[in-house]
Amino acid sequence: MIPTVKELLSSKLEGQAVTVKGWVRTKRQTKSAVFVEINDGSCMANIQCVFDQEKVAEPALAAEFEKTTTGASVSVEGVLIASPGSGQKLEVKANSLRVIGEAPAEAYPLQKKAHSLEFLREIAHLRPRTNTFGAVARVRNRMAFAVHQFFQERGFNYVHTPLITASDAEGAGAMFQVTTLDLARIAAGGAVDYDKDFFGKPAYLTVSGQLNVETYCQAMNRVYTFGPTFRAENSNTTRHLSEFWMIEPEIAFAELEDDIALAKDFILYLVKTALSDCADDLAFFDARIQPGLIDSLGKVAKGSFSRMTYTEAVAELLKHKGVFEFEPYWGCDLQSEHEKFLTEKVVGGPLVVTDYPREIKAFYMKQNDDGKTVAAMDVLVPRFGEIIGGSEREWRLDLLEKRISEVGLNKDSYKWYLDLRRFGSTPHAGFGLGFERLLLYVTGMTNIRDVIPFPRAPRQADF
């Protein structure tokens, strides 16, 4: 393989013949030279290829330059030399150029000008060629790798959980149904005979891999899943997607304190990795998207987490009545504005909130002795709010059966899950981190549809 632009710019190949392949970002000329900037997505930087005007005037090269427009894919050959300019250390003194794929200027939508993020969402198949979305893609790649690094280094096993399920892990009912039945006939007749459906019963796209990964936790101790999940919530907001990726570890013989320690270590690992390995891309986001981003991440990386119970958090919020759009009260689900206020105004840094009311949390969370709260925790960070949600799981069979009945779930659908409590049950805990929400936080992007390659949301399933 030929070297990438990133490899060339960091190489010791000065004075050697090189080949550059990529996409044209800009072409400009002076009386003595023509400058072509090429990017191949391997890094934020372009590599500058310089052609003498005399060379460009040669008929064969002149014909290629006619087709050399922004967006065209090209192959350039030349010698890597020290650059006299201030913008880069190295450039290519070029002697040949070949256009591989044309991008006619009158049709190519990504010309050399600023494009709104809204416009770029309409051309999601081309937006990776912009600086912003190239940077997002590289950070996404590095963070995904870091997720696996973190858990593999700590003895966790990676488990592939199913995308099609008959169980609702959250008990919320906002699930996409999977069927091979003729929907037109169902609409006409009204009744649904699931015996004739593919699985012989109602089946859905998973909202979480947690329940499934718990089965392996109860056999292999430390496990995690990292895959796509689906929610059929009609939420057209900057923080919701219908398809997104979730990271969900589970640890056996563990309680809430173990869960909190793991979550804190995980956040610190990811933030430090982003700062060290994505420096150029974060510098771009800091300059163009979220001023102060690097400083904000740096403060989190120092590792100081405050802690309070949900009850204490609500008490703090009630001291500031009139500040919030949604007034807090004990029993409310904390809103993003509450979480940001707690982290930015009350404690001035990351915060772990524990012991939430059981009525606003999932059925599988361990009930505390007070009968009102569960052994749950959320990790909140400044500028964003909740980034991780987790809990100790209810491992006592009688209490879990009772809770399933209380929330109106079909106990038969959870027989296999209850079996984990019937046979060799252990205290265990875990958490979930929405991968796209992590990326929003690390990049400073403000719309979750801009940190996933092809966003899926209500009325949006293009590409």
Please name every model-derived segment.
Residues 3-252:
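Class II aminoacyl-tRNA synthetase-like tRNA-binding/catalytic domains
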Residues 67, 90, 136-147, 259-263, ...:
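Hydrophobic (often cysteine-bearing) scaffold residues that line and stabilize catalytic clefts
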Residues 108-110, 140, 157-164, 218, ...:
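Short coil/turn segments at secondary-structure boundaries
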Residues 135-139, 255-262, 305, 392, ...:
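Catalytic cores of large soluble enzymes that bind and process phosphate-bearing ligands
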Residues 168-175, 180-193, 265-381, 406-426:
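Metal-assisted phosphate- and nucleotidyl-transfer catalytic regions
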Residues 200, 204, 217-228, 241-255, ...:
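TRNA-recognition modules of translation machinery and tRNA-sensing kinases, especially anticodon-binding
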Residues 219-220, 255-276, 445:
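His/Asp/Glu-rich mid-to-C-terminal helical/loop segments that flank catalytic regions of hydrolases
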